[in-house]
From Swiss-Prot:
General function of this protein: Part of the ABC transporter complex WtpABC involved in molybdate/tungstate import. Binds tungstate and molybdate.
Originating organism: Pyrococcus abyssi (strain GE5 / Orsay)
This protein's record includes keyword Transmembrane helix: no
Protein name: Molybdate/tungstate-binding protein WtpA
Record family assignment: Belongs to the bacterial solute-binding protein 1 family. WtpA subfamily.
Gene3D superfamilies for the chain: Periplasmic binding protein-like II
Lineage: Archaea, Methanobacteriati, Methanobacteriota, Thermococci, Thermococcales
Length: 344
């Protein structure tokens, strides 16, 4: 039995090595590089995941793996492949629907839903009215509207956290029965709404110096930490990872609660960057290995590692909930079929 397992393991290793297109070190060890484009909110868990996978690959597969790791807004991550023609092995996004919308069938034929999150409002003790925000979180929209308070969110055209943030503010209109979107978004930017449908022009213009927009949500972390920005809309996992103070929002607007999906989808947004319309829905992350991945077999090994108990543990340690089980769509590779629930 053990001999059979060893032979099977060796066969897998040789198969991977034969498909790598990598090189060798001076000592003859196989080397390979994985190119990963991922959402900024995945930076911390992916850094740890890559470190642990490198150890695993060297020990179990005999491969010294290096990473070309590029964090950006998820829309930008996808467009690096679809619009700029850049090569990548793996694309991981904060909104799984970007993969079937923009990448299937030309660039990939499967994807996996693997993690969740929620939108919160983060700040520090330096932020104006921080104590009041903590004591009266239901007044968040009143505090953000004050003339001496600055707040930010990421660019809806580049980053799901951005379009989710503005949809959260439109959902807040419905939940609180007050013109929160008009006050916080329409009066301060050129993003506008017709009823519950939002339009984000290709070039976002900020009309109020109190509002800051950056390409991805993690670009705003340093501004808040330094005290140059009071508040920003961010994923809970990122707020936790950076030890920021934050308030949670009602389940009706935080995009966390799957039982509220029918309420969420009342709001939608059309992005000027892609022309696509996106409906508000519970936050679910997605990942895929591309058809023409330079190191496809090794990329699938990385995906297996992410979906393993070790991968789930890394996400839990970084305050991000893992889907149980992860859900896969499309032409799901044999290598991961035992780790996911396959849906049509």
């Amino acid at each position: 039995m053990r001999l059979g397992l060893k032979i099977a393991s060796l066969a897998i290793v040789f198969l991977i090595l034969g498909c790598l297109g990598g090189g060798e070190t001076e000592t003859g060890q196989k080397t390979a590089k994985l190119i990963i484009f991922h959402a900024g909110s995945l930076s911390v868990p992916f850094s740890q995941l890559e470190s642990e996978f490198a150890k695993y690959a060297e020990k179990e597969l005999g491969i010294k793996v290096t990473f070309q790791d590029e964090a950006s807004g998820s829309v930008k991550a996808v467009r690096k492949v679809t619009d700029l023609g850049k090569k990548a092995d793996i694309v991981a996004v904060a909104d799984y629907t970007l993969i079937p919308q923009l990448m299937v069938p030309n660039y990939t034929d499967f994807y996996v839903l693997f993690a969740t999150n929620e939108i919160v409002i983060a700040f520090t003790e330096k932020s104006k009215y921080a104590d009041e925000m903590l004591k009266n979180p239901d007044k968040w929209y009143e505090i953000l509207a004050r003339e001496d308070v600055s707040f930010g969110f990421s660019d809806p055209n580049q980053d799901p956290c951005g379009y989710r943030s503005v949809m959260v503010m439109k959902l807040a209109d419905l939940y609180y029965g007050k013109p929160i979107f008009e006050t916080l978004v329409e009066k301060t930017t050129n993003i506008y709404a017709n009823g519950t449908h939002i339009y984000a022009p290709k070039e976002i213009i900020v009309k109020d110096k109190r509002v800051v927009i950056r390409p991805k949500e993690t670009d705003l972390v340093g501004l808040v930490e330094s005290g140059s920005l009071d508040y920003f809309f961010i994923y809970k996992s990122v707020a936790e990872q950076h030890n920021l103070k934050y308030i949670t929002l009602p389940n009706e607007i935080n995009l966390k609660d799957f039982s509220k999906a029918d309420f969420y989808k009342k709001v939608s947004i059309t992005l000027g960057s892609t022309g696509k319309t996106i409906y508000a829905k519970p936050i679910v992350y997605g990942i895929t290995v591309l058809k023409d991945a330079p190191n496809r077999e090794l990329a699938l090994e990385f995906l297996k590692f992410l979906l393993s108990e070790k991968g789930k543990e890394i996400f839990r340690e970084n305050h991000q909930d893992f889907l149980t089980p992860p859900v896969a769509f499309g032409n799901v590779p044999e290598e991961i079929k035992g780790l996911v629930e396959i849906k049509e």
